[in-house]
Design a protein with these regions (language model features):
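NAD(P)H-binding glycine-rich loop region in Rossmannoid oxidoreductase-like domains
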Residues: 40-78, 101-106
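N-terminal Rossmann NAD(P)H-binding glycine-rich loop of SDR-like oxidoreductase domains
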Residues: 3-23
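SDR active-site strand-loop-helix element
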Residues: 6, 30, 57-61, 94-100, ...
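Adenosine-cofactor binding site in Rossmann-like domains, unifying the SAM/SAH pocket
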Residues: 27-46
Length: 261
């Protein structure tokens, strides 16, 4: 199967593309310099030059959504331009990495530029004959950004420093190698009978403090776990979708820790 993978230089792309290739998929992952998805003319010129002979598109290219900065409306417009410029090309399978941020509260539509763009893209993906949304709430792995919760917690633990949680809440954190299992399943299931939406979550739900305790048990020493807010926050979780013999949260945390030692 020939796959066009957008956003391949991001955390998820750098983790799963080698796994796709190892399993025999033929993956093309142009950089943003090679393929500027925001610019319609650039997209046309790229495919006029290189052709478009793909069986599937995995769309991971996205702007915004970082908790360390606030998004403006340009994030929404640029995300939608990238999406529309690539979904217009016909493929048997179109996989979109959705986000838990596309809905909030009791299934309410997102009110942030990033979240609303994800909501709009997920709705369009549902209408694609071979479309599937893989909804991610939290994803972790060796190559994730240093400011992400689990990476920060592991580094604090290694340095024997306190692990700080701003506000405790139920949080679906999913190992990137398990995300790959969901992606592979979505690519291989017959088009037309594929699920339109899959939540990339585990059956059991954990608070951030539970996850911090898992980190705190990775070696012989212990560190303080500090929670700044007394009141618990809203859950950031999804319903369990599919069982694919996952590695699981605890083992995934251990594997990341061992890789970072």
């Amino acid at each position: 199967m020939k796959i066009l993978f957008t956003g391949g230089n991001g955390f998820i792309g750098r983790e799963v593309i080698p796994l796709l290739k190892k399993d025999g998929f033929e993956v093309t992952a142009p950089s943003s310099r090679e393929l500027n998805l925001i610019d319609n003319k650039s997209v046309r010129e790229y495919f006029d030059k290189n052709g478009f002979e793909y069986d599937a598109v995995v769309h991971a290219a996205v702007l915004g959504g970082r908790r360390v900065s606030q998004d403006d409306l340009l994030v929404y417009f640029d995300n939608m331009r990238m999406f529309e410029n690539i979904i217009s090309y016909k493929v048997d399978r179109f996989i979109h990495f959705d986000s838990g941020a596309s809905l909030y509260g009791s299934g309410k539509i997102a009110h942030t530029p990033y979240g609303f763009s994800k909501y709009c893209m997920s709705r369009s993906t549902e209408e694609h004959p071979g479309g599937t949304n893989l909804k991610i709430y939290g994803c972790f792995g060796v190559l994730e950004d240093d400011h992400r919760f689990l990476k920060t917690a592991i580094k604090k633990y290694k340095n024997k420093e306190p692990i700080t949680i701003f506000q405790d809440k139920l949080f679906d954190l999913f190992y990137v190698k398990d995300l790959y299992k969901v992606l592979k399943y979505s690519l291989e299931v017959s088009s037309g009978i594929q699920p339109k939406n899959l939540n990339c979550v585990y059956d059991r739900k954990y608070y951030l403090s539970d996850i911090a305790e898992m980190v705190n048990g990775l070696d012989s020493h212990q560190v303080p776990i500090l929670i700044e807010e007394n009141e618990k926050g809203n859950a950031y979780c999804g319903n369990y979708s599919i069982d694919l013999n996952y590695t699981g949260l605890e083992q995934g945390i251990m594997e990341v820790y061992e890789s970072l030692r």
